[in-house]
Amino acid sequence: MLYEKFEYNINNLIGNFSLSKISIAVSGGSDSVALLYLANIWAEKNNIELFVISVDHNLREQSKQETHYIQNISNSLNRKHYSLSFDHQNNFSNLQERAREGRYDLMTNLCLELDILVLLTAHHEDDYVENFCLRLERNSGIFGLSSSNINWYNNIHIIRPLYNIPKSELVEYLVSHNIKWFEDESNSSDKYRRNVIRQKLAKGADYIRHFSKPVYREEFKGDTERSTAAYTSVREDASTGTASKLSLEAKCGKMSKAAIISQQLKTNKRIENEFKPELISAIAEAVKIFEYGFAFLDLVKFDKFSNEVKVQIINFLLIIISGQSRAARFYSVEPILKLITQDVNFKNTLHGCIIKRIQNELLIYREFGKKLPESKILLDKSVIWDNRFCITKNQEAPNCFVTHLSLKDYKIIKKQLDLEPLKNLSCKNHNAVLLTLPIIKILEKVIAIPHISYYDNDMWNFEVSFSPNFVSRFTHFC
């Protein structure tokens, strides 16, 4: 029964993908070990090569045993196993989030090296329930409360074929097949809110919402018919757009697991049928992204979309232009949206970007601030710089590296640069944008700025493309 459900899920999620190989993330816990055995059956049946990936976060002594165990299972199944290591650098602040990002960076980079398009992960039904509860407590909007069984990370398709399978079924499968797994001791700690929620739901108790913050924020002016009720978005009637704090607590303050799953499905359906199509339309109609790594937002077209989608659009652009993997918080985006409604020109910094209003357009370009992007040596044929640009060398260029243009370098080569095309495209913000572009240097000399076709010698030939490490559950950048 379990395999049939898994097979139906994975075939539906993969759809028309023509795959000869696929990767799977396995930690040693019951969820991922069960996924490994299920995926192995499916891969054999469909003649697909399966690559097993484990990441050691170097935080628990047991993790080495887990990795060794997964390697042994992989060998017994005749599957290639890759063991990766996350370096936490003895920095334990916000460790869970950094470890998650580091894990996905490592795994997806390996997938790119192996020319694999899909990575399977073991997120199951209980994980989705816990995520919904946590996001509800953070006052997430409807996009935040929704869940997805497919998303993108580093241009790799992340697929979750266990999304509607409870953990109990996975454990039962392992026990019935006499398969061993490891329990992470940190999962029983009350230190993390997720664990508290998990333990309550596991006992069949109702989830009781922890109200750590005010439930509602001030709504934006206008757009009342489809307002987000300040982005809590758990209401069932989208047309009213208003609800009292008391009614929301009554509705979501106490919920059974079944009620949470039901609410999650309703939220997902609304996203899929209403907001996701609107988001895609908004990007197509109102957004222009240029190879120089900046973007324009048409504010006249932007104005017609719902507030939920407006927040997503701003975050979409901030992530792409900054090269960061995480979205800005709502409270950071809210002032920008309010400024837009005031119909006056402004210039702000947010999330590693400059946001500048020019008449009826919003220009967004990179801002380094105090943290300059790391220089990259061009040892291989290509390199990713600032998480945004891919630079490729088409000839031998020893001792060259990619960095940004300093004011000192700019003054030296200024008269040799043709900035007219960039000037026209950026509404005369060419100098600011120029300083955010990748340049190639040998020692202290600038030998190339590929974006503006500057080369100090005809022998050089470099290609550059705007390829941000974009992460989204709702849309994809390529």
From Swiss-Prot:
MF-aspect GO terms: ATP binding; tRNA(Ile)-lysidine synthase activity
Cellular component aspect of the GO annotation: cytoplasm
Cell compartments where the protein resides: Cytoplasm
Chief location bin: cytoplasm
Record Pfam families: ATP_bind_3
Residues that coordinate or bind ATP: 27-32
GO terms of biological process kind: tRNA modification
InterPro entries, alphabetized: Rossmann-like_a/b/a_fold (IPR014729), RPE1 (IPR005728), TilS/TtcA_N (IPR011063), tRNA_Ile_lys_synt (IPR012094), tRNA_Ile_lys_synt_N (IPR012795)
Keywords associated with the record: ATP-binding, Cytoplasm, Ligase, Nucleotide-binding, tRNA processing
Family per similarity comment: Belongs to the tRNA(Ile)-lysidine synthase family.
UniProt comment concerning the protein's domains: The N-terminal region contains the highly conserved SGGXDS motif, predicted to be a P-loop motif involved in ATP binding.
NCBIfam families the record matches: lysidine_TilS_N, RPE1
Protein name according to UniProt: tRNA(Ile)-lysidine synthase
Organism: Rickettsia rickettsii (strain Sheila Smith)
